Amino acid sequence: MTDFADLTLDELRIALAPDIAASAIFDGWNETALVAAAEMAGADVDVAKLAFPGAKPMDMIAAWIASVDAAMEAEWPAERLATLKIRERIRTLVAFRLEAVTHIDEAVRRALAVMAQPQNAARSLKLGWHSADIMWRLAGDTATDYNHYTKRAILAGIYSATLAVFVNDDSEGKADTYAFLDRRIDGVMKFEKAKAQFLGKDRELPSLTRFLGRLRYPAR
């Protein structure tokens, strides 16, 4: 059992986040859910309120997302994923995140509604980007060029779109959600393959600069 008295406020936020999400199913992301979570976990309610000043929904949602990130990293470290193909690494990580929220669909739905509000858009994008970055790093991505950014932007888009399907999916075992996820990942993999082939061909094309140089200084 967690001894909440020994936790820093940052640690307390992460520790309480899963229980807040569970309470948000019924109460929404608000102070009622925060108090219920603290009581459920056996934490001091006043300290819990100190960890989440004003019980702001986005603060609680951000802590919840961070808790899912941490659980994902603990369950699927890079070494464990290394034996899988890149497609399966990404799918495994996204699937883990979906499984982590399988029984709290309504909390996810409410969270997405809060995150979609105009005043929360920038922070929501940042949170999505951060989670996508963690997934790519666990998958072994070391890109530092423009691919670093495009990969994360695309994965964040896939994940958010999959969550939108997830909260409305009544199929057994969320089969429709996983089918949607597979189609999106397959589409990206085909695009990446085509892009790699195109860039490979591009590298084989004669250099215009080299060609002009030869015209100016013909070989002897």
Predicted feature residues:
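Hydrophobic/aromatic-rich alpha-helical bundle segments in the mid-to-C-terminal region
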Residues: D141-A156, S160-R203
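Acidic/His metal-coordination segments adjacent to aromatic residues that form catalytic metal sites
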Residues: E79-T83, R137-T142
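C-terminal ligand-sensing/allosteric alpha-helical core of TetR-family HTH transcriptional regulators
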Residues: A71, I86-A100, L127, S131-L138, ...
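Hydrophobic alpha-helical connector segments
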Residues: D10, I14, A74-R110
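Short, amphipathic alpha-helix enriched in basic
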Residues: T2-D46, F52-A62, A66
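Long, charge-rich low-complexity segments
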Residues: K193-R220
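Amphipathic alpha-helical packing segments from all-alpha helical-bundle domains
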Residues: Q119-D141, T150-A156, S160
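Internal, conserved structured core segments that host functional sites
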Residues: L98-S131
